[in-house]
């Protein structure tokens, strides 16, 4: 007799393999069998979000727009946030929004600071990824190990940093009665 294998379908509102892999890693630990696929969607915010509102809105838009033929959809957006007492005045944070067709839950990664020349270029209108590609000599660094890996000497890569925000966004879903979720 054939056994039936149940799995959860999850869409990630991005074609970035790091975001898909991080989502699959975290949700696989929580749910077991998951099928995670990247779905290209528009974030509805500038390519380089600056500030809490833009970054969170980008993550939420990605999650909502990726919700089709799935149980959960995930939106992940990185952005620069003003933080006092930092060298540059900004910290990079990744926000994750998870949508089930009714509720959005949010989580954020550990933040880190880019070098001053990177922040200056971004504030002048360039994307972090382009500046970091030039700085490191690695093409599409953000789709690979990420700037955080370069800056931390390999102690944390972008997949690990992205896993943090996905896990934090899952906390209410892992404790639904504490958060008033079904």
UniProtKB/Swiss-Prot annotation:
Free-text cofactor note: Binds 1 divalent metal cation per subunit; can use either Mg(2+) or Mn(2+).
Binding site for Mg(2+): 42, 69
Entry's Gene Ontology molecular function annotations: ITPase activity; metal ion binding; nucleotide binding; ribonucleoside triphosphate phosphatase activity
The keyword Nucleotide-binding appears for this protein: yes
Keyword line: Hydrolase, Magnesium, Manganese, Metal-binding, Nucleotide metabolism, Nucleotide-binding
Quaternary state and interactors: Homodimer.
Its biological purpose: Phosphatase that hydrolyzes non-canonical purine nucleotides such as XTP and ITP to their respective diphosphate derivatives. Probably excludes non-canonical purines from DNA/RNA precursor pool, thus preventing their incorporation into DNA/RNA and avoiding chromosomal lesions.
Protein name: Probable inosine/xanthosine triphosphatase
Source species of the chain: Methanothermobacter thermautotrophicus (strain ATCC 29096 / DSM 1053 / JCM 10044 / NBRC 100330 / Delta H) (Methanobacterium thermoautotrophicum)
Biological classification of the source: Archaea, Methanobacteriati, Methanobacteriota, Methanomada group, Methanobacteria
């Amino acid at each position: 007799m054939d056994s039936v294998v149940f799995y959860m379908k999850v869409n990630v509102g991005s074609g970035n393999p790091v975001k898909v892999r991080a989502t699959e890693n975290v949700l696989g630990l929580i749910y077991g069998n998951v099928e995670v696929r990247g779905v290209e969607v528009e974030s509805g915010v500038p390519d380089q979000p600056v500030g809490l509102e833009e970054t969170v809105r980008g993550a939420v838009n990605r999650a909502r727009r990726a919700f089709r033929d799935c149980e959960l959809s995930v939106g992940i957006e990185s952005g620069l946030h003003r933080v006092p007492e930092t060298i540059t005045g900004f910290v990079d944070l990744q926000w994750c929004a998870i949508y089930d067709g009714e509720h959005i839950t949010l989580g954020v990664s550990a933040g880190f600071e880019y070098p001053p020349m990177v922040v200056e270029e971004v504030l002048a209108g360039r994307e972090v990824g382009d500046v970091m590609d030039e700085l490191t000599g690695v093409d599409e660094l953000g789709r690979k190990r990420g700037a955080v890996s370069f800056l931390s000497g390999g102690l944390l890569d972008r997949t690990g940093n992205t896993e943090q925000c996905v896990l934090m966004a899952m906390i209410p879903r892992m404790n639904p009665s504490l958060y008033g979720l079904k």
